Amino acid sequence: MGNIEEQVLIPYPVMAPEQKETLHGVIDSVKQLLGSRDADFRKWDRAGEMPPEFVEELRQFGLFGLVVPEAFGGLGFKSAAYARTLQEVAKYDASVAVTIGAHSSIGMRGLLLFGTDEQKQRFLPKLATGEMIAAFALTEAGAGSDAAALKTRAVREGDEWVLSGNKLWITNGGIADFFTVFARTGELEGKPHITAFIVTRDMPGVSVGPHEDKMGLRASSTTTVHFDEVRVPHANMLGEENKGFKIAMAILNNGRTGLGGGTIGAMKKLIAQCTKYANERKTFGKSIREYGMIKHKVGQMVIDCYATEAAVDMVAELIDSGYEDYAVEAAISKVFASEALWHT
């Protein structure tokens, strides 16, 4: 923290040519799929639901396999290309970006980072095609980033873990088949041990609550998820036993470039809409773009967007270059990006 890695910034991060070529194809596909759907997005937002038929279109266009390695049927995007893709998606609809992002940024990220070869062989091909959609199940009524307050518990019985508890505000909860779940598996000196598990929807005892009626992102699925004495095979334990807190933090840090990319896309869309209106709107015989306050507002929007894109690019380069400690930088990019979008 506090050290500027010159080799990351000079020269400025550049995407590999082969990945850039694939990215351009994906962006063209996103424009083709989403470019004429504005009326649909508005309707779905009012209804608070994304139709299953449209989710199937996302599958067909390969948007659930962005970060899955090519060996398992995905596109193998690194963080920079992934963030750029979510930037494009978010220009059209935030609920769609969140659905894809929750799947790739956090839902299955633990499998990519900590999964065994057997686990990857078992799940990644289905996650790449969207046959399985992923969700990240950490938050509870009294616990979120404070993972130590988790009440969901898992007790080992032979080759299985008996998992019980309730998770809250789980993005993709209503459509997910694959859950990365965090539970207490013991204590040491009053401090809880947390372990991560892969839980699938078809396991007896897994159920979801109704779709949450949210203020925004209404078409994305957000639900409670309930685990009632779910018997999870020991083979589905993700990473090491009692190392779940570190796993959760690693997932969240690694996935934050996706959120940053989405905010950039939203900001660019807002800037385009604002400048269009400023050019068209006239008062007292002249365009409002000529007023100093309007110039200042639009200028600040562009500055914030530029700075956000630079921060997200830097964090993506840290991740893609193999740096192990980028937690502070990832957190900064998330806070700055979300606040910049709010100001915009």
Where are these regions (language model features)?
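Short Gly/Pro-enriched turn/cap motifs at secondary-structure boundaries
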Residues: 142-145, 169-172, 186-188, 214-221
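Alpha-helix capping/hinge segments and adjacent helical runs
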Residues: 32, 62, 217, 324, ...
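C-terminal helix-coil-helix/basic helical segment that borders enzyme active sites and/or dimer interfaces
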Residues: 42-45, 305-336
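Amphipathic, small/basic residue-rich leader segments at the start of a protein or domain
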Residues: 1-101, 109-133, 142-145, 156-157, ...
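Cytochrome P450 C-terminal beta-domain/meander region
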Residues: 146-164
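Amphipathic, well-ordered alpha-helical segments in soluble domains
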Residues: 270-274, 304-314, 340, 344
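A short core secondary-structure module
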Residues: 164-208
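Glycine-rich beta->alpha junctions and the first turn(s) of the following alpha-helix
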Residues: 207-306, 335
